[in-house]
């Protein structure tokens, strides 16, 4: 069977499963999620052993530290996945809810009912936990999902998908509502992108090259989880110690993830007080600074060799590493102009104690999450109370930001009549 034929087979099965999922009760869907949590606990040794095979192969292939970090499963991450299953199971079921209702002069009762999207294809790289996060959200929302993870995580994803399908069957739901693509290579992805007769939406989550490739190839709607070029802007009135903690957390905690900080913008009136603190604390944690000409002399507290002159290509760059671009700006206007030019609509942060400035930044910074005096690392479905996320949409249709259960549904009009006909 060719890759195209295999993708068509998966697509047809998913389409049938999606119809079955529209009949699934909230109790059956929740049973699948809670059963999955139990199975993940029981199968943890086997899943971690499969992950160890992937990590060994990735190291042998010379993968960098950021990719190895995203690939790695630990007992703590397994516990997070189990907690996500339980949390999503306890969320309200959006399917079938009537959001609004009104009566027309002719007596017709009109409403909008929330329904599943249908079949969702998820194309992602490296992170095996996405296999579970994506699947549980799709199941809760009554969708079928086709999962295509990166080839570097094939053993991990296979073990997780088998566990997932077992939980589905135990709950009386079709195993084909959550299928994993095991065919390697770009030909399978390209074929998947053409199955608009089966797939209702495709979600690419990974590097810029992957997202662009899927967006250009897809014949169905795309929800893009694009790159995270996240900025923090520091106003002169900010609490600098608090701002330092926010910048440190955003850059150092997990530098390889999409909500990590990539660029620090500092108002000129705060630069001389703030940048030495940044250089000392983040420099000691191993951060390399790409500083503009104004910032360079203010960062001499960094370890030797950790501050280098900024190049044009350092702006708008997602480093996936302990690297931070630093720029001094004259005003909030200049900071917002910089964000508009170099940002990726992911996450933008301001540190200020001025309410009017904070509200202006919230209004004008164009990103899926804009925060005041809080870390960029909070742009995450779990941290925002969604339980888990299938991705962070950086496109405004049909969702913008972290996508939880409700974002994996849509609405249809429902009309209740008593024999009315149009005049």
From Swiss-Prot:
GO BP terms: L-proline biosynthetic process
Location of the protein in the cell: Cytoplasm
GO molecular function: glutamate-5-semialdehyde dehydrogenase activity; NADP binding
CDD domains hit by this protein: ALDH_F18-19_ProA-GPR
SUPFAM superfamilies: ALDH-like
Protein origin, superkingdom: Bacteria
Keyword line: Amino-acid biosynthesis, Cytoplasm, NADP, Oxidoreductase, Proline biosynthesis
Keyword Amino-acid biosynthesis part of the UniProt annotation: yes
GO cellular component terms given for this protein: cytoplasm
EC number in record: 1.2.1.41
Pathway: Amino-acid biosynthesis; L-proline biosynthesis; L-glutamate 5-semialdehyde from L-glutamate: step 2/2
InterPro entries per UniProt: Ald_DH/histidinol_DH, Ald_DH_C, Ald_DH_N, Aldehyde_DH_dom, G-glutamylP_reductase_CS, Glu-5-SA_DH, GPR_dom
Reaction(s) the record says it catalyses: L-glutamate 5-semialdehyde + phosphate + NADP(+) = L-glutamyl 5-phosphate + NADPH + H(+)
Keyword Amino-acid biosynthesis: yes
Function: Catalyzes the NADPH-dependent reduction of L-glutamate 5-phosphate into L-glutamate 5-semialdehyde and phosphate. The product spontaneously undergoes cyclization to form 1-pyrroline-5-carboxylate.
Family classification: Belongs to the gamma-glutamyl phosphate reductase family.
Protein name listed in UniProt: Gamma-glutamyl phosphate reductase
Native organism: Desulfovibrio desulfuricans (strain ATCC 27774 / DSM 6949 / MB)
């Amino acid at each position: 069977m060719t890759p195209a034929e295999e993708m068509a087979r998966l697509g047809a099965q998913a389409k049938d499963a999606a119809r079955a999922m529209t009949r699934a009760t909230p109790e059956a869907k929740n049973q699948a999620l809670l059963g999955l949590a139990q199975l993940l606990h029981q199968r943890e040794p086997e899943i971690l052993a499969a992950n160890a095979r992937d990590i060994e192969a990735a190291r042998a292939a010379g993968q960098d530290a950021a990719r190895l970090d995203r690939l790695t499963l630990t007992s703590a991450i397994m516990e997070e996945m189990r907690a996500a299953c339980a949390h999503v199971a306890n969320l309200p079921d959006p399917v079938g809810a009537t959001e609004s209702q009104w009566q027309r002069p002719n007596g017709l009762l009109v409403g909008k009912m929330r329904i599943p999207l249908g079949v969702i294809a998820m194309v992602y790289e490296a992170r095996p936990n996405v296999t579970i996060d994506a699947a549980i959200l799709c199941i809760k929302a009554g969708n079928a999902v086709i999962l295509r993870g990166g080839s570097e995580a094939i053993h991990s994803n296979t073990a997780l998908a088998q566990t997932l399908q077992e939980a589905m069957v135990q709950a009386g739901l079709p195993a084909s509502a959550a299928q994993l693509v095991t065919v390697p290579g770009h030909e399978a992805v390209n074929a998947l992108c053409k199955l608009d007769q089966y797939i209702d939406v495709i979600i690419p989550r990974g590097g810029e090259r992957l997202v662009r490739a899927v967006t250009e190839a897809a014949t169905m709607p795309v929800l893009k989880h694009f790159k995270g070029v996240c900025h923090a802007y520091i106003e002169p009135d900010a609490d600098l110690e608090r701002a330092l903690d926010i910048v440190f957390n955003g850059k150092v905690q997990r530098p390889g993830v999409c909500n990590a900080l990539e660029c620090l913008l500092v108002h000129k009136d705060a630069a001389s007080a703030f940048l030495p603190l940044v250089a000392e604390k983040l420099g000691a944690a191993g951060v390399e600074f790409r500083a503009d000409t104004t910032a360079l002399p203010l960062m001499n507290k960094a370890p030797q060799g950790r501050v280098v002159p900024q190049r044009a290509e350092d702006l708008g760059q997602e480093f996936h590493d302990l690297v931070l671009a630093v720029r001094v700006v004259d005003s909030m206007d200049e900071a917002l102009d910089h964000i508009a030019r170099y940002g990726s609509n992911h996450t933008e942060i301001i540190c200020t104690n001025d309410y009017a400035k904070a509200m202006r930044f919230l209004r004008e910074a164009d990103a899926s999450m804009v925060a005041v005096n809080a870390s960029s690392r909070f742009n995450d479905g779990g941290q925002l109370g969604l339980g888990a996320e299938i991705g962070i949409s950086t496109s405004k249709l049909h969702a913008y930001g972290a996508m939880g259960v409700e974002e994996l549904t849509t609405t249809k009009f429902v009309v209740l009549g008593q024999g009315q006909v149009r005049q």
